[in-house]
Amino acid sequence: MTLWMASPPEVHSALLSSGPGPGSVLSAAGVWSSLSAEYAAVADELIGLLGAVQTGAWQGPSAAAYVAAHAPYLAWLMRASETSAEAAARHETVAAAYTTAVAAMPTLVELAANHTLHGVLVATNFFGINTIPIALNEADYARMWTQAASTMATYQAVAEAAVASAPQTTPAPPILAAEAADDDHDHDHDHGGEPTPLDYLVAEILRIISGGRLIWDPAEGTMNGIPFEDYTDAAQPIWWVVRAIEFSKDFETFVQELFVNPVEAFQFYFELLLFDYPTHIVQIVEALSQSPQLLAVALGSVISNLGAVTGFAGLSGLAGMQPAAIPALAPVAAAPSTLPAVAMAPTMAAPGAAVASAAAPASAPAASTVASATPAPPPAPGAAGFGYPYAIAPPGIGFGSGMSASASAQRKAPQPDSAAAAAAAAAVRDQARARRRRRVTRRGYGDEFMDMNIDVDPDWGPPPGEDPVTSTVASDRGAGHLGFAGTARREAVADAAGMTTLAGDDFGDGPTTPMVPGSWDPDRDAPGSAEPGDRG
């Protein structure tokens, strides 16, 4: 609610008195009253007409059907007459509230007079003689401020309540025969029936969201007084709202019948599939044919979905294919782990004889292998071996591969399968074993250190056969005269003494006086006996 106390009374009085006044509101109330009277007159005329039909020459089933078809319209006329009369009363209430507010509001003339009197009292307030009248004038202005704010608050509350309680007029229902609802549908399912509290809640939400433009009657199965079957234009948004409500009610009916009578439930469902849903699909197709843009969008979505379906169908076809049968390989006889060298060339006579003479000390199976130098007989025609699709035969057993599965940079050499290679590997293993045995006998400590227990006197002279090197002396050039003022500078600079070793022991017999540079006078007296010229 607006905070009316925040504004002075001049603002409220000016806004309230400068408007069009209650004339427009009273005019609207008069129109609603005349509309209510017109509805009542039409209802009375229709009642007389229906009575005449029932009692006249049209008496019979046709007259009864005529009266039954006009019954919803007659009820709507009576309800509309009452609604219009109530709306007129609400407008009159708002007009009365406005008139009361104008009468209770302080006028601009009264407010101007209060301000004028206040200025005069303040101007003639000599020695405080107008203090009491000024206080009374200010109190009267505060009263008018409060009165204006309360008047506006009361007027707002009454007007908002009247507008909020004004009823809404529903659209007029069509005048149709009782069997007209079956023209579009060839089934007899009802969209009304036993309404639930949830249905009324949904109906109220629809009415609030649409601003009173969607009035669903769950008991009668109508939208804005029109049956669901009469909405046939799928291009209108209300068609989709009606279809959503219809499908939800159909599903609710199916579930209820499923627990009571499953046979009737499935019969109801098949009726929907055969008659109701195809009708709505035809309505959608008609709406799309009237809008080419919507038709293009719908066809695009359908084509994309069909493409996905065909793709899955192809995958399902692949699932039914049987893999090609691969002939089983002929079993290969197991070879011994260590093959003799003579088995590499069984078809060569001369090398085979030489190797046979060299392998004489070998075992009996090796000798029999060497002796069989003739080629092996061809395989039987019925046992077909595995064929290679290349003109060159694959490598034989023992052929090394050039590829390596190791992650190291060094490439592994193919392992030889000869006796010489086996002997070389055994020799390498023996050498490694002997090296490990020798390493075990050695002592290896990581914390050992060298003992320097030999005294050597340094020789600072030049090497034999070479000229002596000039010893290091202090330079006589540099920053100039340094020291205190009045002190004498020594020109003679002594040589560096170098490293000096002093004899002594650990019991206090060593030197106690620190060494000083050679340029210092060792015979110098105590500091108290120095000459005056040597100090600053």
Swiss-Prot record:
Question: Superkingdom of the source?
Answer: Bacteria
Q: Where is the composition biased (Basic and acidic residues)?
A: 521-536
Task: List the residue ranges of the region (Disordered).
Answer: 501-536
Q: Name one GO biological process term.
A: response to host immune response
Q: Which Pfam families match?
A: PPE, PPE-PPW
The UniProt entry, under InterPro entries, shows: PPE-PPW_C (IPR043641), PPE_dom (IPR000030), PPE_sf (IPR038332)
Report TM segments.
none
Tell me which family the UniProt entry assigns to this protein. Answer: Belongs to the mycobacterial PPE family.
Q: What else is known?
A: Was identified as a high-confidence drug target.
- What is the protein named? Uncharacterized PPE family protein PPE3
